[in-house]
From Swiss-Prot:
This is tRNA (guanine-N(7)-)-methyltransferase. S-adenosyl-L-methionine binds at E68, E93, D120, D143. It comes from Vibrio vulnificus (strain YJ016). Its EC number is 2.1.1.33. The gene is trmB. HAMAP family: tRNA_methyltr_TrmB (MF_01057). The active site is at D143. Coiled coil: none annotated. Catalyzes the formation of N(7)-methylguanine at position 46 (m7G46) in tRNA. GO terms for molecular function: tRNA (guanine(46)-N7)-methyltransferase activity. Keywords: Methyltransferase, S-adenosyl-L-methionine, Transferase, tRNA processing. NCBIfam families: tRNA (guanosine(46)-N7)-methyltransferase TrmB. It is an enzyme of class 2 (transferase).
């Protein structure tokens, strides 16, 4: 895989230069992860190609598609797929051990409504995801880039929000974000309030309680015990 970069923006959210949003990180796979990659990739893995996907062809049905960017080790994604067999789940992750772990868990769970990719998310969106096709886009706990001088590297920017909007089903699709970094939550709200074609679906304030469909991770549960917050945000595509 060639090296990729993230996008960098100015204070107005305008693209300054392309530095890809995710970098493919190779890592050492455990034997279990390696076996899962070999055994499960033919049925659950999707190779990158500059060609739009046909969701019915990918999953064998017309069920709603939930896409997650950066699923980590995949435990939550597998749990969501197991709990919602009436939906299709599509995960993109650049860390190959995470993809292997996800496939291993998916095999153990016996689910068939999950597909995964190991590639740069922006390239996948640009070349493979059909417009107006996603029921939900999930972005859970992305890199917060804590230092102020690095805030421009955060994936949630106006151009990214527009890219997501184009892929969501009109007047129906949901962009669901979650972060445990309050400053990033505020940044997400600021960007999404500026992004055209969206409406915050929170009934009171900017944030929503953790939805039942998003599993509570071990890391998150530990954070709760220590008094750390987590902010869930949902915006609906309205135009």
């Amino acid at each position: 895989m060639s090296e990729v970069t993230t996008n960098e923006y100015n204070e107005d959210g305008k693209l300054i230069r392309k530095i890809r949003s995710f970098v493919r990180r190779e890592g050492r796979l455990t034997k279990g992860q390696e076996n899962a990659m070999k055994e499960c990739w033919p049925t659950m893995g999707i190779d990158y190609q500059k060609q739009l996907l046909d969701w019915k062809e990918v999953f064998g049905n017309d069920n709603p598609v939930v896409l997650e960017i950066g699923f980590g080790m995949g435990a939550s994604l597998v749990e969501m797929a197991k709990n919602a067999p009436e939906k299709n789940f599509f995960g993109i992750e650049v860390h190959s051990p995470g993809v292997g772990a996800c496939l291993s868990d998916a095999r153990e769970a016996g689910i068939s409504n999950l597909r995964v990719m190991c590639h740069d998310a922006v390239e996948v969106f640009e070349h493979m995801i059909p417009n107006d096709s996603l029921a939900t886009l999930q972005l859970f706990f992305p890199d917060p880039w804590h230092k102020k001088r690095h805030h421009k590297r955060r994936i949630v920017q106006l151009e990214f929000a527009e890219m997501v909007r184009q892929k969501l089903i009109p007047n129906e699709g949901i962009f669901h974000m979650a972060t445990d970094w309050e400053n990033y939550a505020e940044h997400m709200i600021e960007i999404m309030n500026q992004a055209p074609g969206y409406r915050n679906i929170a009934e009171a304030g900017d944030y929503i309680p953790r939805p039942e469909e998003r599993p509570l991770t071990k890391f998150e549960a530990r954070g709760h015990r220590l008094g750390h917050g987590v902010w869930d945000i949902k915006f609906k595509r309205v135009s």
